[in-house]
């Protein structure tokens, strides 16, 4: 079965930062109906944990543009910042010219605007408590931390599932 034929049924993202700001990393995964999964990660030398959370979500949404996914698919995240930004704050930020309720410029505006791009799929975010034993969240956390610390970590892809 090729990547294009697989049906994505779950996704998860996380961000981490060693110091805040400091070196950061993000992790993401997509789980497929056939039991396979694919993992991704990246880093930035000087960033914040919130930027890494947003970067992970943006990356996974970009990937899901080109993958068939179940209508029930959600993206699991332990970031209330990401969830509240997408679900509660963004409409008001846009109305106010990307300013907060106090009139200050929205932080991480470049990433928020990218997440709001109309070509990205609209997928529900699902809050999961971090470090709680939730398998996908624990895995993307391990990926994010490894990337933030410059450690090597084996990422699953279609060749090594």
Curated annotation (Swiss-Prot):
Annotated GO biological process: DNA replication, removal of RNA primer
Enzyme Commission number(s): 3.1.26.4
Domain RNase H type-1: 5-149
Keyword Cytoplasm belongs to the record: yes
Classification via Gene3D superfamilies: Ribonuclease H-like superfamily/Ribonuclease H
Cofactor(s) listed: Mg(2+)
GO molecular function: magnesium ion binding; nucleic acid binding; RNA-DNA hybrid ribonuclease activity
PROSITE patterns xrefs: RNASE_H_1
Swiss-Prot/TrEMBL keywords: Cytoplasm, Endonuclease, Hydrolase, Magnesium, Metal-binding, Nuclease
Binding annotation for Mg(2+) 2: 14, 141
Pfam families with a match to the protein in the record: RNase_H (PF00075)
Cofactor note text: Binds 1 Mg(2+) ion per subunit. May bind a second metal ion at a regulatory site, or after substrate binding.
GO cellular component entries: cytoplasm
Catalyzed reaction equations: Endonucleolytic cleavage to 5'-phosphomonoester
Coiled-coil portions: none
Keyword Metal-binding: yes
Primary localization: cytoplasm
Entry similarity comment: Belongs to the RNase H family.
Quaternary organization: Monomer.
Role of this protein: Endonuclease that specifically degrades the RNA of RNA-DNA hybrids.
Protein known as: Ribonuclease H
UniProt organism field: Prochlorococcus marinus (strain NATL2A)
Gene: rnhA
């Amino acid at each position: 079965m090729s990547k294009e034929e697989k049906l994505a049924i779950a996704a998860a993202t996380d961000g981490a930062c060693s110091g805040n700001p400091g070196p950061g990393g993000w992790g993401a995964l997509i789980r497929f109906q056939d039991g396979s999964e694919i993992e991704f990660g990246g880093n930035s030398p000087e960033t914040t944990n919130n930027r890494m959370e947003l970067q992970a979500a943006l990356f996974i949404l970009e990937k899901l543009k080109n993958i068939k996914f179940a209508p029930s698919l959600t993206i699991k995240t332990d970031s209330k910042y990401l969830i509240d930004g997408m679900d509660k704050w963004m409409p008001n930020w846009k109305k106010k010219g990307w300013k907060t309720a106090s009139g200050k410029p929205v932080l991480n505006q470049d990433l928020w605007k990218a997440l709001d791009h109309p070509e990205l799929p609209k997928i529900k975010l699902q809050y999961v408590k971090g470090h709680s034993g939730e398998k996908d969240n624990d895995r993307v956390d391990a990926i994010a931390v490894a990337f933030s610390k410059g450690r090597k970590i084996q990422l699953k892809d279609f060749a090594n599932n």
